[in-house]
From Swiss-Prot:
It comes from the Bacteria. Transmembrane segments: none annotated. Belongs to the TRAFAC class translation factor GTPase superfamily. Classic translation factor GTPase family. EF-G/EF-2 subfamily. It comes from Rhizobium leguminosarum bv. trifolii (strain WSM2304). Keywords: Cytoplasm, Elongation factor, GTP-binding, Nucleotide-binding, Protein biosynthesis. This is Elongation factor G. Catalyzes the GTP-dependent ribosomal translocation step during translation elongation. During this step, the ribosome changes from the pre-translocational (PRE) to the post-translocational (POST) state as the newly formed A-site-bound peptidyl-tRNA and P-site-bound deacylated tRNA move to the P and E sites, respectively. Catalyzes the coordinated movement of the two tRNA molecules, the mRNA and conformational changes in the ribosome. It is found in: Cytoplasm. One of its GO terms (biological process) is ribosome disassembly.
Amino acid sequence: MAREYKIEDYRNFGIMAHIDAGKTTTTERILYYTGKSHKIGEVHDGAATMDWMEQEQERGITITSAATTTFWKGRDGKTRRFNIIDTPGHVDFTIEVERSLRVLDGAIALLDANAGVEPQTETVWRQAEKYNVPRMIFCNKMDKTGADFYRSVEMIKTRLGATAVVMQLPIGAETEFKGVIDLIEMNALIWRDESLGAQWDVVEIPEDMKAKAEEYREKLIETVVDIDEAAMEAYLEGILPDNDQIRALVRRGTIDVKFHPMFCGTAFKNKGVQPLLDAVVDYLPSPMDIPAIKGIDFKTEADIERHADDAEPLSMLAFKIMNDPFVGSLTFARIYSGKLEKGASVMNTVKDKRERVGRMLQMHSNSREDIEEAFAGDIVALAGLKETTTGDTLCDPLKPVILERMEFPEPVIQIAIEPKTKGDQEKMGLALNRLAAEDPSFRVKTDQESGQTIIAGMGELHLDIIVDRMRREFKVEATVGAPQVAYRETITRQHEEDYTHKKQSGGTGQFARVKIVFEPNPEGDDFKFESKIVGGSVPKEYIPGVQKGIESVLSSGPLAGFPMLGVKATLIDGAFHDVDSSVLAFEIASRACFREAAKKAGAQLLEPMMKVEVVTPEDYVGDVIGDLNSRRGQIQGQESRGIAVVINANVPLANMFKYVDNLRSMSQGRAQYTMTFDHYSPVPSNVATEIQAKYSGQK
């Protein structure tokens, strides 16, 4: 089957915004006008096509990026293929935004005309900068009370440090909003309310807006000629670019991320969506316009590039795993190069495993169509993959490559969870493992001491929704506990312990003597074991038992029962009995030997120190630093990034719970932070006493 649409006619883009700026409604309108949706779904009544998880429809927030393929006939009458990814705007779901930005070529940033640039707009904008994603801006909700297009333009400059190239001016605002002025064609588009936005009239610019339109067209031309020497020279000589040249310059500047074309409208009232779709064709990149994807050769580890070309070897990135109620597990993948046929065998180079593509689906929100073949630039859903997880590379087994992996933040909050009924234990385990496979920012583990199941995620809403999904999709009711910190223990000085284990009261006896030196491991946090036995005082075959015995005690330290780090043990002497000694006897002896020694070797409690990066507007720097200091934080430095300030600090995890709420209120929601594990550090003695008292009773 040959490729139906040329790769230069593809547009892979996402819609990103603050929560409630109208992303889902805008996507709905796009699907409606491109003919994929027969009825417009409203978020207000929980019927939106993209929001296909039950919870999203209830909460009216988009949680999962749904990938949709649709088609649009541009101004030139030629049909283009759109692959659209809808992304969430809530801070707990930034992982979804990150992973969709990684596989997109361009994006539409949505603003609420009333609120302008909101905190989460800043967050997703910075994420898009990280991946250098070309963006256009759509100033939505122009019909809303308080809508102010010109203030939004100003906020893009002051809050995002970005240049918006105004392509349209609004005609009227709030309830009077009825159309836009096209600054390239210099005409006005007035929508007919009764046609659901499908029809509009092209008329002359209203008399009272002509001067403003001229002023903004001049600004538009000045900005775009600035990126091209020849155009700039001609402009200085009084020769203005024609409309096609202006479009070509806007396209170039957008793809090079020099500036961002800005449009306006109201998706809810069906005004301004079609010109936005024409702009996607005119200004956002095709897969051919973006740099080749970088990777490393699986065998030689040399740097290589894969270009958006069907003739190149197959390479694709799995960016999302989803459980589909009808098909089972689906892996969403972006094909960067080559082509893929149904039934093909591909290699997962991250896991070093072969996978077979059982079914290949083209997704439209929550309906699907089976396809036989897919090409470079496509975003497809694959069924039948067993080993693949988010961020893995799938490729041609004969030309293996590892594409740059996605980075996922470490979970920052963990809670204990247990099923309400014993019978649900197994179902809960299965449900949690399924959910963890879908979402790399969600982790599940079992606490060795208490046997409790611990779940960890990006925030309280994130974990709420996991528990909620478990109840809805897997019918498991669960009880959750309070957040916990993973402490560790270590020793701080050298200690030599001599221990004899004997049991010789009738029957087969047990005998083993060990003399071991315990000390901090200078090489790091791992456990290191050495034997310096000479002369056979402990026979060779018993030495693994000595190591095993010590290792079995490392999981529970002497202070509060936390796992131990950074211990080195050297077996220097011992004794055995010809009949009564065994591997087990030496295991028991070394276990008891370490238990005794740990109490005498300066045991110390360690806590996880987190590397915290706060990005905040300058106004809040003093408050943020003061607050981090009050949390026993150590400020490592600060620097300017655009118009924001980045503060780096190391802070104990124990003092970071509820931090997101504090930071939001301290900065009116404008600051954001990331937190990753850095190292373990000794707990101050006054805090250690409290922790020991709290946990010793539990262990």
